[in-house]
UniProtKB/Swiss-Prot annotation:
Protein name as catalogued: Probable transcriptional regulatory protein RPC_4807
Gene Ontology BP annotations: regulation of DNA-templated transcription
Disulphide bonds in the chain: none
Primary residence: cytoplasm
Superkingdom of the organism of origin: Bacteria
Cellular localization per UniProt: Cytoplasm
Alphabetical list of SUPFAM superfamilies matching this protein: YebC-like
InterPro entries: Integrase-like_N, TACO1_YebC-like_2nd/3rd_dom, TACO1_YebC_N, Transcrip_reg_TACO1-like, Transcrip_reg_TACO1-like_dom3, YebC-like
Swiss-Prot/TrEMBL keywords: Cytoplasm, DNA-binding, Transcription, Transcription regulation
UniProt source species: Rhodopseudomonas palustris (strain BisB18)
């Protein structure tokens, strides 16, 4: 399994683990509120807010919930969330990045540190593992919107760095600086993307045995279940058999 596939599997597990829609909607709403508060409540003028709304729509979040989250940012009585990135090493020395939005820094740090420690890993300082990842933009489209060749041609013309096409869809990667422009150009050609967001893409992935892989997947599950955690990224590869066993 390639590192790219591992990234997809982690996201798939996130969807499975967040089967409780109330928890998932809460996380999506939090990102929408923060994005609207940091920028403008108009998604046409706020790329981060637009990305958050796209993610919410993909999970069938009701329109009323989305609008309520935006209005919450405009009001003066809404919660204030801090954006925090945690970095550390999981079992087997695998690099892990955790993105969180929290209204209690001490609680979040304590919880996340305990998850790493209990799994046999350790939470490090900011910057301790980020150098092993590239901060990049990802734009996803359904496979039916274009052939692999047409998507590749359009992506190159738009200034993208890489394209991965399969039966499950097209994934276009672009630098952090050009991401918004690439997404806009492709959406003008193919319609709204099913995902458009900044991500941490591992530069290389580390193969791990099933025992270590199981510990890592359990750590990721714990992290993703935490109310404050928005995204988890890691640079490891596991066997398809283990993913099937763990329900990924």
């Amino acid at each position: 399994m390639a590192g790219h596939s591992q990234f997809k599997n982690i996201m798939h597990r996130k969807g499975r683990q967040d089967a409780q829609k109330s928890k998932l909607f809460s996380k999506l709403a939090r990102e929408i509120t923060v994005a609207a508060k940091l920028g403008t409540p108009d998604p046409a003028m706020n790329a981060r807010l637009r990305s958050a709304i796209i993610a919410a729509r993909q999970e069938n979040m009701p329109k009323d919930n989305i609008e309520r989250a935006i209005k919450k940012a405009i009001g003066s009585d809404g919660e204030n969330y801090d954006e925090i990135r945690y970095e550390g090493y999981g079992p087997g020395g695998v690099a892990v990045i955790v993105e969180a939005l929290t209204d209690n820094r001490n609680r979040a740090a304590s919880d996340i540190r305990s998850y790493f420690t209990k799994s046999g890993g350790n939470l490090g300082e900011t910057g301790s593992v980020a150098f092993m990842f590239d901060r990049t933009g990802i734009i996803e489209f359904d496979a039916k919107v274009a052939s692999a060749d047409d998507m590749l041609d359009a992506a190159i013309e738009a200034g993208a760095d890489d394209v991965l096409s399969s039966d499950s869809g097209h994934e276009v990667y672009a630098s952090q600086d050009s991401f918004r422009e690439v997404a806009k150009a492709l959406e003008q050609k193919f319609g709204e993307a099913r995902k458009a967001a900044l991500t941490w893409k591992p530069q290389n992935t580390v193969p791990v045995d099933d025992e270590t892989g199981e510990k890592l997947l359990k750590l990721i599950d714990l992290l993703q279940e935490h109310d404050d955690v928005q995204n988890v990224y890691a640079n490891f590869e596991v066997s398809d058999a283990l993913m099937a066993k763990m329900g990924g």
